[in-house]
Amino acid sequence: MGAITGEGDFVYLGELAQDRALEAMLKKAEEIGLDKGVAFIVVQKKGQQVHRIAYTVLELERDPNLDKAGDIGRNYFGTVMLKLAQMLATYENSVPSDDRPLKAGEVDYEGGIVFEPDDDHIVLIGYSGGTEEEDVDISLIGKTKLLKPL
């Protein structure tokens, strides 16, 4: 199977499909008025360590808003990697959970989704840059695009 393009029903394994999905996520972010944010996609064989984290950056961070007391700004890359850390530890969507306390280096922000496109692989997709609901919607766009034939 080609690492760049994938083949047949397994197109999502290819870098081209993953890059196309990341582009669709950034396009959706821009369409809803976001000009900052970071998207990621991880596709891995079940039971194996992650071998590739694909990501793309619309804008890495937001400066502090001096009109809001206490606003220190936001590093979207840092936030999205914290979401990914939790997702890699649990293989569940990035959501608050009463079942598992957060560890240092994790956040309970929504915006990351996990799914199994076949019996052998698991996919993690996430975005940080909007509200939690916007981040989830953008991640779902990435999932749809990733699974679409080239």
For each of these PLM feature ranges, what is it?
Residues M1-L150:
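Flexible, solvent-exposed loop/hinge segments and secondary-structure transition points
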